[in-house]
Amino acid sequence: MPTGHRDHLKRKTAPKSWMLDKQGGTFALMPASGPHKKTECIPLGYLISRFLRYASNFKELSIILAEKNIKVNGRVRTNSHFPVGLFDVVSIEKTGEHFRVLYNVHKKFHLHRISSEEASYRLTKVTKKYENQGIPYIVSSCGLSIRFCDPAIDLGYTIKISNETSKVIEYIVPGPDKVIFVSRGKARGRVGVINTISTQGKETVYGMTDFAGNTFSCTSKSCILIGESSENIWITLPKERGIRQSELEKINAQLGEMIDTEVAEVSE
């Protein structure tokens, strides 16, 4: 049976992070080839129509994009299939709005409103480092190749990239007390401060504590650094600040603290 690139995507097999309803049709937008993996991105058309609700049908969406009103990381994008991933900045020229693409604590995509100053940069992780004809290169998780970079930058570092010049502004070195954002796995969308760093086989495991005091862990491949410390975070976070509540905590937040349900010992 012939195999190759698929041009169509069924709605049932689309990533759950897109939050598509099952009865909205048979097919979904297929992300185009671009800077992000197809399992870790969302088409630009869904951000405009389903998240921002600026378009109610494909015709309106096409008009908005054709008028070059939408920018992603400072560049005009007119393709509704363009893949937008974690920490990318979506800007709307006519309204002056800027949004950063994040995951919420339920592992779904979320558009977080940011200021124009914060919209001037994005964060990405260094995944490759090599040298070609004496020129040092680094490759980021968003597919960007940068040459003549600081030789101190190594694999696993987080770099802040200017959306205007595509040059490295700053970088973060992994270590204790650094703030990370989990981008993969069961803890996707959670934010925590690194407490311990251990090695299990070939994997580096971070033990972390979130801003509510809950502890969890993830591998270094599943997260990205977003701050030097809890007081120095490079991006603004949604109101839940990456804290995932348990079912009991959700009920307590809605109905108030529950009474003590411990069973008292019955004396005969």
Swiss-Prot record:
Keyword field? Cytoplasm, Ribonucleoprotein, Ribosomal protein, RNA-binding, rRNA-binding
Segments forming domain S4 RNA-binding: 42-105
- List, in alphabetical order, the Gene Ontology terms for molecular function in this entry: rRNA binding; structural constituent of ribosome
UniProt cross-references to InterPro entries, sorted A to Z? Rib_uL2_dom2 (IPR014722), Ribosomal_eS4 (IPR000876), Ribosomal_eS4_central_region (IPR013845), Ribosomal_eS4_central_sf (IPR038237), Ribosomal_eS4_N (IPR013843), S4_RNA-bd_sf (IPR036986)
Residues annotated as signal peptide: none
Where is this chain's protein located in or outside the cell? Cytoplasm
Q: Which GO terms describe its cellular component?
A: cytosolic small ribosomal subunit
**One of the GO biological process terms:** translation
Q: Quaternary state and partners of this protein?
A: Component of the small ribosomal subunit.
The similarity comment for this entry is: Belongs to the eukaryotic ribosomal protein eS4 family.
What name is this protein filed under? Small ribosomal subunit protein eS4
Q: What organism is the protein native to?
A: Encephalitozoon cuniculi (strain GB-M1) (Microsporidian parasite)
GN (gene name): RPS4
